[in-house]
Amino acid sequence: MSPIALNLLQSTPYQVGGSLAANHPSYSQREADRELLAQLRAGKFCYVFNCRQMGKSSLRVRAMHQLQQDGVVCVSIDITSLGTEADPQKWYNGIITQLYLGLPLAGKVALKPWLREREQLSPIQKLREFVETIILQTIGDRQIVIFIDEIDKVLSLPFSLDDFFSYIRFCYNQRADDHEYNRLSFALFGVATPSDLIDNKTQTPFNIGQAIALTGFTLTEALPLSAGLPVDEVSAREILGEILAWTGGQPFLTQKVCELVAEALQKGDLDCQSQTIATTIAQLIEEKIIRHWESNDEPVHFRTIGDRLLKDQARSGQLLGLYQEILHKGAIPADDSVEQTVLRLTGLVVKVKGQLRPYNPIYQAIFNAQWVSKELNKLRPYGTNLQAWINSNYQDSSRLLRGEALREALAWASSKNLSGVDYRYLNASQNQEQEASLAANQILTQANVKAKRMISFGIVVLMMSLGGSAIALSQAYFATLKQQRSQQGTELQRLGTSAQRQFTFDQIPGLVTALEAGNQLHHLVKADETLSQYPATSPLVSLQQILSQIAEKNVLTGHRDGVTSVAISSHKNLIASASRDGTVHLWTPQGEFLREFTGHTGSIYRVDFSPNGKIFATAGQDQTVKIWDLDGNLLQTLKGHQDSVYSVSFSPDGEILASTSRDRTVRLWHWRSGKTLAVLGGHTKSVDDAQFSPDGQTLVSVCRDGQIRLWDLDGNLIRQFGLPEVAFFGVNWHPNGNLLAVAADDGTVRLWTPQGEIKATLSGHDEFVTRVVFTPDGKQLFSSSSNGSVIHWSTSGKMLKKYQGYPEAIFGLALASNGALLAIGAENNLVKVWDMSPKSDLVNLNLPAVLGAVAENAKTNTIALAMENEPLILFNTKNRSRQFLSDASQNLDRLKFSADGQWLLGQRGRQWQLWQLQTKSQLLKTWRTDISRVYDVDLRTTPTSPQWAIAMATGSGEVQLWQGTKNNQTSGNQSQGVPIELNDPIVLALGNSIQRKEPIRSVSLHPTLPQLAAGDEQGNLTLWNFDGTLIRSIVAHGDRLNQLQYSPNGKYLLSAGREGTAKIWSVEGQLLHTLKSDPLPIDQIAISPDSQWIATAASDGMVRLWDQQGNLRGEFTSTSGSLLGLDFNRQGQWLLAVAQNGDLQSWPVTPEKERLRQLVEQGCDWLRDYLATEKQPAQTYSLEFCQPTGN
């Protein structure tokens, strides 16, 4: 080794761990460096979220250094230094202190006196004032960037930081009102996801920020590291390439391996000859890193990854299962789901070209399949039995759990997210246990009836003979009944919970279980019992949830081998299924078997109806295409292919037939004469599908060689495009002919234009996609996969719903011409029929953007919907019409209807707008306030009164009460109420210069009295008169008071807190009832128009119905998670909820037993076709109560 090389190594040592200095010679610049600098220079809010030891801190140091050289003022806040035990006041003071120390403010302000003088302010107000009056005013006209490192540490704080992240969003929104804010930018760094950091999705800054992707080093980016290798430049580059092949460019590992290689080269322990470099580096990595990795893990790296993977016991099973699947398959499609995102944050896997793969071979070697199995078995209480069941190909029922072991396993699993095989095992165990449970319950019911007869008889006899002992005997009698009811309730509760889990993987059996439990519960309870008195509630909840989501309508049995294809005719919606057993079965849409068609030798791979639905064609393994009529007559056999025929398709006029084959050709036939019109060659592998365009002028073929070819009807190639690295299995034309949906073996569906441009890539399947089909209106599509999943997509590429649970590959997928019937054929010999008609209780509003604010009004059946960069929509829930308010500001933060629904108030920042909606929508007034933060608002006005009032709950701890009058101007026969006066607000507040004022979180105006109620951050409830006099202040909740609402009749006040309780108060402030729900915050409340019913919604989407006496009367689960809006309809008969994704869900407001009866009836009605269809024993259920005589 030359002295020059040695000196170079000594002057540029590698740094393993920690942040690199801005001018460190081994710093390798990546694309993230360039993007972060460009975005920050443009004044954007940026965030860099990635796993540990990926170079985030080094990136921050480098970016700060370069910006400072440009004259930008930079400051870095390290969240770790603030600790995790501080209260909000101390934490925010710590932020202000770090800003003071890090910025050139020394001598400009005395910080400690400044903080003391503002003790009465809330923490976020104090931070805002410091930024606005000290930082922006003191630091001239220079740009300021605030870097915040280790932001994930805030997750350990005992209080919410929604306000902090909302403030970042405020700073960017404030630019429209105050140009000084254009100089201020933020950059966040950490190991987290945006959804981890802020609960309030309407106030998140991350949807206006720029995510900076931080990837591993490429060879070009890593070249500065080669300077430290004591060899010539060519050898150094080659060695670096081998190192990156092992590390995947992971910065920490790359530095560590470079250091090991450099040391070995210095000592002469490494042969750098070109032909041996790969082998010697592999040996070095095996010896120094992989072997005995626990002792070699210095600085700690691998243990950090393992700890992050295993630390959350509720989620670790799911993460391990997902990682196990990636190890087994090599890669799976990336869908950016929560579990995939969390797994990526461990650092174990990386997203590459739409695929989730192991990050590098070193991780694969350390965290290998054996390590995963070992950790999974540590987690699972049933690991041994599960493995034995898997080894038996899922057949050994003796390995399934029973009794107490099953209950313990379900209890353990209830709080965890597990892998698919776990749920499959528990589901199979539950199915087996269910049969025994139902039989036992029937025996218990019969015994109960017998016991009642015997005890009643005994009471009569003994009362006659014992006299005074009758009371004791009566008590024993009722105690016996109570015990039996409790036992039945316990079992029914378990069955109801089991039904929901079972439904996830097998829809009809899940519904059957819920029906069995619901029917038994219906007979067990009395009409006058409230839900809180029920011995079990899960049957009712599970029935509601299942019936709002179920799609599976019927299961058609009879094939003796896997189903390869299904088709639905335009004539009577008849269903044809083709199978490897060499037959086609024909069914009615209700599931009645019509006939079997035989004639092929070997498997049948495809079936397709003619456009008029009167005939169909089949493609066979025997190299033939056959044409049949519906009566079973063979009309034609087409011969010419030299290998198996994989698909057949009729032209729109029904005269031409296209077939594809394993012989690498497509043939066009005049099927009536049997004549071959053209043979389309050029494919280099099997051709799996071909389809005519809607106008019949073009044929598209897709091939396993990754090519898509367009042909005219004369057989001439029009165009060819594709992706040579993938194989295509299916294709479908958009109804207007402007798009092609193509199913691929990489788990994606791609949407191409006929010109060869990819418009969207739909990722979500875990294995290759087999079929794809557009809905008739072209707005949506369905795809199926070899792993047994079906996904419902929007044409824009959004995944609407993923259906899982099929144990085998799905090769058949067909949609009826009305879009309401979906047929699915799978390798398990079954055809499943789904009803895709929209559920009456669940409507997707198909909104063009993310919802930001929602307001509902019962009187007018109207929902106001505000979105990002879209007009305000008024949606009528009765007739489902839409009205657009084009004069509304976009990106509204808040909306509020008046109680009569004739007025609508909107807010964005400091700007307010008021509309009158009586006849036609009219923007009446736009004004601005000096309020920087409003948490809640209420609006009161009536057609009979000229007075109106607006109350605003502010972050400064005040309520601002605005009042005005309407000037009734007559124009023709139409009276218009226009507010012409806006009085200065009355400011209502508790506290003084010594007592700190907490932010007001909620406010409500009494419907008739000049009175309002307000709730603050600490759970205090305060009542005021409109003249500003205080009525009463009460400690109402133990935490933030989230919601307040006076009843429409004005007789009571409803409050809801973050600690999960709601309370009913008199208008004088006396506590009447406490509604106990759960520990989760209550985000939404509603009161029916007649004030008889109350609804609350928790942050997890659980909606509860109460009466005004505080009795729990119903529980409903939102299928879309947390809600943005909740209200009753005008008649108070339905409860309506709006979710973030635009789903509108409704539930009936009826007494419990009647609702349960209706649900059982609805479930039986759903299964009518299924129960009437002859089934194999495994799919047979009696459900005698679903028969007409049992109702």
Swiss-Prot record:
CDD domains: WD40 (cd00200). Pfam families: AAA_35 (PF14516), WD40 (PF00400). The keyword Lipid biosynthesis does not apply. SMART domains: WD40. The keyword Repeat applies. WD repeats lie at residues 558-588, 599-629, 640-670, 682-712, 723-753, 764-794, 805-835, 995-1025, 1036-1066, 1077-1107, 1118-1148. InterPro entries: G-protein_beta_WD-40_rep (IPR020472), P-loop_NTPase (IPR027417), WD40/YVTN_repeat-like_dom_sf (IPR015943), WD40_repeat_CS (IPR019775), WD40_repeat_dom_sf (IPR036322), WD40_rpt (IPR001680). Keywords: Repeat, WD repeat. This is Uncharacterized WD repeat-containing protein slr0143. It comes from Synechocystis sp. (strain ATCC 27184 / PCC 6803 / Kazusa). The lineage of its organism: Bacteria, Bacillati, Cyanobacteriota, Cyanophyceae, Synechococcales.
